């Protein structure tokens, strides 16, 4: 499992004093209010202030004191140590842990690897790339087992649930 988890991406500058606008990669933006530090390119940075906006977060990060400096951080990921992440309820997983999981069906046939997790509102959908691309709804009727340690996701055979 990855030691660091991405919680946001710097998408723009905000103002002239070095604040950055962050697109959250977490389900709960309020978590940013509790963050004391993040890692950018592996370097620890202290968070000095946090303002929540409807779809973004504005952060003042130590060492970023001008719009020019803030501009250098565009498209950079903000990461936290896994040990500082929220504790997930049983049956929930971090997207970072699902990416690159091998997907097999209950008969042992290789389907491919999870390349992305699409958030749809009602349920997640796993984008699985193999011989072809398959979109797998992440629901209990289809996904029968997730083994993060062994990077394996087991699903019901495609012919049972997939329309031709």
UniProtKB/Swiss-Prot annotation:
MF terms (GO), sorted A to Z: ribosome binding
Keyword Metal-binding: no
Domain remark in the UniProt entry: The PRC barrel domain binds ribosomal protein uS19.
GO cellular component: cytoplasm; ribosome
Domain (PRC barrel): residue spans on this chain: 90-161
Domain of life from the UniProt record: Bacteria
Function: An accessory protein needed during the final step in the assembly of 30S ribosomal subunit, possibly for assembly of the head region. Essential for efficient processing of 16S rRNA. May be needed both before and after RbfA during the maturation of 16S rRNA. It has affinity for free ribosomal 30S subunits but not for 70S ribosomes.
A GO BP entry: rRNA processing
Main localisation: cytoplasm
Subunit field text: Binds ribosomal protein uS19.
Record protein name field: Ribosome maturation factor RimM
InterPro entries tied to this protein: PRC_barrel-like_sf, PRC_RimM, RimM, RimM_N, RimM_N_sf, Transl_B-barrel_sf
Cellular localization per UniProt: Cytoplasm
Family according to the record: Belongs to the RimM family.
Short name of one Pfam family: PRC_RimM
Keyword terms of this UniProt record: Chaperone, Cytoplasm, Ribosome biogenesis, rRNA processing
